[in-house]
A protein has these predicted regions:
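Short acidic-hydrophobic, aromatic-tinged amphipathic segments that line or gate anion-handling sites
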Residues: 202-206
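Short glycine/proline-centered loop/turn elements that form peptide/ligand docking sites
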Residues: 26, 93-94, 98, 148, ...
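Active-site neighborhood of HAD-like aspartate-dependent phosphohydrolases
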Residues: 1-46
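Substrate-recognition "cap/lid" segment bordering the active-site pocket of phosphatases
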Residues: 85, 113-164, 169-178, 192-196
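Short, acidic loop-to-helix structural element flanking the phosphoryl-transfer center
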Residues: 81-108, 114-118, 145
Length: 217
């Protein structure tokens, strides 16, 4: 039986990597460290998936450039202090390896910067299993479709043969903007209620169920 999809594009944080708690703490702490108003962790977690510049604007509006730069530097320092300790969700590595072996093209589209993604791939040992990756250092932040558009062009896959997997509304809106089908996961940054307004073909509460679905494609 022929596959429904040729290309599977993964978000990273909150989809493959169990990193949402650490990211939230890093931005909450950074805001306090540079003298900005305290952040509610739930509010802070809702920006996961955006690029850092866009996240700062959503959280604090049009603050002075020097304050935004100080926050970005402090967040980056906080994040990299614990980055090497961030695990993948249980079963994620095996799922990626199996999908690769079965002939799927695999890619990453993330709000992380290039340095952060490269370090994450190095730490988890999965870099060789992805055919291409895109970050906010090369593309517009989600939900702009540029990451998906460039991945499909680079890997020569049509939108109807591409599947996006993510844990935020930014992932699902990006997929819609690129005319790509999507799967939502609720074990990451955003809840089922937050994600249910998008036309995902499936929604899963734990990685194990997502893996079962993907391995049945």
């Amino acid at each position: 039986m022929s596959k429904q999809f040729d290309l599977i594009v993964w978000d990273w944080d909150g989809t493959l990597a169990d990193s949402t708690g650490m990211i939230t703490q890093a931005i909450v702490s950074a805001a306090a460290q540079v003298g900005l108003p305290s952040l509610d962790p739930q509010v802070a977690s809702n920006i996961i998936g955006l690029g850092l510049k866009e996240s700062i604007y959503v959280l604090f509006g049009d603050i002075p450039a020097e304050k935004a730069q100080a926050l970005a530097r402090q967040y980056t320092a906080n994040y990299y202090a614990g980055e090497s300790e961030i695990p993948l969700f249980a079963g994620a590595a095996d799922t990626i390896k199996t999908l690769n072996k079965r002939g799927f093209k695999l890619a990453v589209a993330t709000g992380k910067g290039r340095r952060g993604l490269n370090l994450a791939l190095e730490h988890c040992g999965l870099g060789n299993y992805f055919h291409a990756t895109k970050t906010v250092d090369e593309c517009f932040s989600k939900p702009h479709p540029q990451m998906l558009d460039e991945l499909m062009d680079e890997l020569v896959v049509r939108p109807e043969r591409t599947l996006m997997i993510g844990d935020t509304s930014y992932d699902l809106q990006m997929a819609q903007n690129a005319n790509v089908q999507a799967v939502a996961v609720t074990y990451g940054a955003q809840s089922r209620d937050k994600l249910s307004g998008y036309n995902s073909i499936a929604m899963f509460n734990q990685f194990e169920d997502l893996s079962t679905f993907l391995l049945s494609l």
